[in-house]
Swiss-Prot record:
<dbReference type="GO" id="GO:1990904">
    <property type="term" value="C:ribonucleoprotein complex"/>
</dbReference>
<dbReference type="GO" id="GO:0003735">
    <property type="term" value="F:structural constituent of ribosome"/>
</dbReference>
<dbReference type="GO" id="GO:0019843">
    <property type="term" value="F:rRNA binding"/>
</dbReference>
<dbReference type="InterPro" id="IPR035987">
    <property type="entry name" value="Ribosomal_uS8_sf"/>
</dbReference>
<keyword id="KW-0687">Ribonucleoprotein</keyword>
<keyword id="KW-0694">RNA-binding</keyword>
<dbReference type="GO" id="GO:0005840">
    <property type="term" value="C:ribosome"/>
</dbReference>
<dbReference type="GO" id="GO:0006412">
    <property type="term" value="P:translation"/>
</dbReference>
<comment type="function">
    <text>One of the primary rRNA binding proteins, it binds directly to 16S rRNA central domain where it helps coordinate assembly of the platform of the 30S subunit.</text>
</comment>
<comment type="similarity">
    <text>Belongs to the universal ribosomal protein uS8 family.</text>
</comment>
<dbReference type="InterPro" id="IPR047863">
    <property type="entry name" value="Ribosomal_uS8_CS"/>
</dbReference>
<keyword id="KW-0699">rRNA-binding</keyword>
<dbReference type="Pfam" id="PF00410">
    <property type="entry name" value="Ribosomal_S8"/>
</dbReference>
<protein>
    <recommendedName>
        <fullName>Small ribosomal subunit protein uS8</fullName>
    </recommendedName>
</protein>
<keyword id="KW-0689">Ribosomal protein</keyword>
<comment type="subunit">
    <text>Part of the 30S ribosomal subunit. Contacts proteins S5 and S12.</text>
</comment>
<dbReference type="InterPro" id="IPR000630">
    <property type="entry name" value="Ribosomal_uS8"/>
</dbReference>
């Protein structure tokens, strides 16, 4: 079966595993998914992400993070730019998520980065997802 939106599939797998408090989730790998996992780790939304080589494209193993009392660190994930409706932001229109409490993941000409990094670098791009 052909997957039309692999980034949405990644976010849905993380969201579903987070809702049932799984320790880890495995996602088919791609370059952009590795970059998204790197950003989630840097921003403290996940504990770790590792790439596991297999005979095909590889797997990204994402270890989810929970707070004291087993409360979720990730409260929401939302795909913004979709294959049917791409969403772009200019360098002066980069969105803030929940007034800066969340994070927007943006694909720019210089790579995949957070909304804060895009504002500092004065670059715009495709708004892939919001996470809070």
């Amino acid at each position: 079966m052909v997957m039309t939106d692999p980034i949405a599939d990644m976010l849905t797998r993380i969201r579903n595993a987070n809702m049932v408090r799984h320790e880890k989730v495995e996602i088919p790998a791609s370059t952009i998914k590795k970059e998204i996992a790197r950003i989630l780790k840097e921003e403290g939304f996940i504990r770790d992400a590792e790439f596991v080589e297999d005979n095909k494209q590889g797997i990204i193993r994402v270890f989810l993070k929970y707070g004291a009392g087993n409360e979720r660190v990730i409260t929401g994930l939302k795909r913004i730019s979709k294959p049917g409706l791409r969403v772009y932001a200019k360098n002066n229109e980069v969105p803030k998520v929940l007034g800066g409490l969340g994070c927007a993941i943006i694909s720019t000409s210089t790579g995949v980065m957070t909304d804060k990094q895009a504002r500092q670098a004065h670059v715009g791009g495709e708004v892939l997802a919001y996470i809070w």
